[in-house]
């Protein structure tokens, strides 16, 4: 019996094939220098290679002893990456799905919603789970909480209306059913009208304002100086000046007494379409009649009206 077991173990421990009988295909390593000509220089890690080879040998031996025996599972060769983000600022993160933007936490997200007291005999209502906004687009007004100010207000208004309805129904418990329903309908119509009046001015008032450049005329009464400027930053679509200009002598801030769109005098276009264009002037000292749009594409151009920046 001993000789039979020794022969069997010899066949298990010494495989019939030679492990170095075939040729190894050496893959090309991109980061390897042409001067490195060692035998095992092409492999990324020789320890991993020999570990895999020994594991294959063990698997072959165990399959001969018992097909059900398999080597223990080992930890996968993966790497975990953690990202720490300031909750008060937006941060762009590269993940497996592509570039994503982690939005800052809204100030009203941590406030507890108004909960009505539980009724008698009913179990305690579970707490609401916190819902985080989805990442829709980087430049979408729905993506950030500060660009969508109406969502929180709508949720607060709906919670207030529900609380008022529950309190009104409990306070009017002794009334008849018909009168109680009429009172609820009247209160509901009043609350809906009040909510519409509160939300309407907020919706008309934008949270961010785009700026555009216009041409303005200034006049300082103290110094009796008049000057022009083609770089008056106004709110888009209006003549409201966002940044004031200072007088060159007394350094007082003044608003222009007249603001116009930057356009050519002859063709009345922001980009001149005249066959014979006027000469290009210095953008630092422009003149009204010489703004022709020939400096398009430059950092300081006469006909650039829109800005990619917005003021919150």
From Swiss-Prot:
Ovary. GO terms for biological process: negative regulation of translation; oogenesis; translation. One of its GO terms (cellular component) is cytoplasm. Residues 86-95, 113-128 have a biased composition (Polar residues). The keyword Metal-binding applies. A zinc finger (3CxxC-type) spans 214-297. Residues 79-133, 150-205 are annotated as: Disordered. Keywords: Cytoplasm, Developmental protein, Differentiation, Metal-binding, Oogenesis, RNA-binding, Zinc, Zinc-finger. Residues 152-196 have a biased composition (Basic and acidic residues). Belongs to the ZAR1 family. mRNA-binding protein required for maternal mRNA storage, translation and degradation during oocyte maturation. Probably promotes formation of some phase-separated membraneless compartment that stores maternal mRNAs in oocytes: acts by undergoing liquid-liquid phase separation upon binding to maternal mRNAs. Binds to the 3'-UTR of maternal mRNAs in immature oocytes, inhibiting their translation. GO terms for molecular function: mRNA binding; zinc ion binding. This is Zygote arrest protein 1.L. Disordered regions undergo liquid-liquid phase separation (LLPS) for the formation of membraneless compartments that store maternal mRNAs in oocytes. The 3CxxC-type mediates binding to the 3'-UTR of mRNAs. It comes from Xenopus laevis (African clawed frog). InterPro entries: Zar1, ZAR1/RTP1-5-like_Znf-3CxxC. It is found in: Cytoplasm, Cytoplasmic ribonucleoprotein granule. Signal peptide: none annotated.
């Amino acid at each position: 019996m001993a000789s039979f077991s020794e022969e069997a173990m010899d066949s298990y421990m010494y495989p019939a094939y030679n492990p170095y009988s075939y040729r190894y295909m050496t893959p090309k390593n991109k980061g390897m220098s042409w001067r490195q000509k060692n035998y095992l220089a092409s492999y990324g890690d020789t320890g991993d290679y020999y570990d895999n080879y020994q594991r294959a040998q063990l698997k072959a031996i165990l399959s001969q002893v018992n097909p059900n025996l398999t080597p223990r599972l080992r930890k996968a060769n993966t790497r975990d990456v953690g990202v720490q983000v300031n909750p008060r600022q937006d941060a762009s993160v590269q993940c497996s799905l592509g570039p994503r933007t982690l939005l800052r936490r809204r100030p009203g997200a941590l406030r507890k919603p108004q909960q009505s007291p539980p009724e008698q005999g009913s179990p305690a209502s579970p707490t609401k789970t916190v819902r985080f906004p989805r990442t829709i687009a980087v430049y979408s007004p729905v993506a950030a909480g500060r660009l969508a100010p109406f969502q929180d207000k709508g949720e607060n208004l709906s919670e207030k209306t529900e609380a008022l309805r529950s309190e009104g129904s409990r306070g009017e418990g002794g009334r008849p059913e018909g009168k109680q329903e009429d009172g609820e309908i009247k209160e509901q119509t009043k609350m809906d009208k009040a909510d519409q009046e509160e939300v309407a001015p907020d919706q008309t008032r934008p949270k961010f304002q785009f700026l555009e450049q216009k041409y303005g005329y200034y006049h300082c009464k103290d110094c009796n100086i008049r000057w022009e400027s083609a770089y008056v930053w106004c709110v888009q679509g209006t003549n409201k000046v966002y940044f004031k200009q200072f007088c060159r002598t007394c350094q007082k801030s003044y608003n222009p007494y007249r603001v116009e769109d930057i356009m050519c005098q002859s063709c009345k276009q922001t980009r001149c379409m005249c066959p014979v264009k006027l000469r290009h002037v210095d953008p630092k000292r422009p003149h009204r009649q010489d703004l022709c749009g020939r400096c398009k594409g430059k950092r300081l151009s006469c006909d650039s009206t829109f800005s990619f920046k917005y003021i919150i």
